[in-house]
Amino acid sequence: MMAKPARRRCKNDECREWFHPAFANQWWCSPECGTKIALERRSKEREKAEKAAEKKRRREEQKQKDKLKIRKLALKPRSYWIKQAQQAVNAFIRERDRDLPCISCGTLTSAQWDAGHYRTTAAAPQLRFNERNIHKQCVVCNQHKSGNLVPYRVELISRIGQEAVDEIESNHNRHRWTIEECKAIKAEYQQKLKDLRNSRSEAA
């Protein structure tokens, strides 16, 4: 003969009376309480299902947004990716040279700091991402004095040496940067900037 289930409290929060269940999985003391518990359980299950459906909808929506973003990026012209790569390189140069003065005029104060090219991107596009060809420069020298190249060259020789400057000046190997190259350069210099900042914060 099976033992009777032990006395338990009704699961209806408004009741909570003790009762002797007729079977093991009975958690209500009366049909009224049983109905109320069943309705509450159904309501919770519906709410759970609605939340799951909403979560799935948001996930699908995000997936569609990501796909659209990828499609839009795939349609971006080469010029867009060159600009993206250049911005990443320039940000690294400004951080690399943050404690140095303007390479042309030597000022330590500027309304804006640029990453100025010794040989311009128009004259030598193959050197647009070359770190030795780019240095921190004040906005006046870079944008209002056409790079202020005479003193730039003097300081450049002091920083990287005559031989390296000669290599830059004699480089005429024109190169057409591809979109894939630009994407790789952008990723590389974003990581280099992050690593440089981390190493400096650890050393501080």
UniProtKB/Swiss-Prot annotation:
InterPro entries assigned to the protein according to its UniProt record, in alphabetical order: Phage_lambda_NinG
Gene encoding the protein: ninG
Segments for region (Disordered): 40-66
Domain of life: Viruses
Record organism: Escherichia phage lambda (Bacteriophage lambda)
Protein name (database record): Protein ninG
Pfam family, one: NinG
Family, per entry: Belongs to the ninG family.
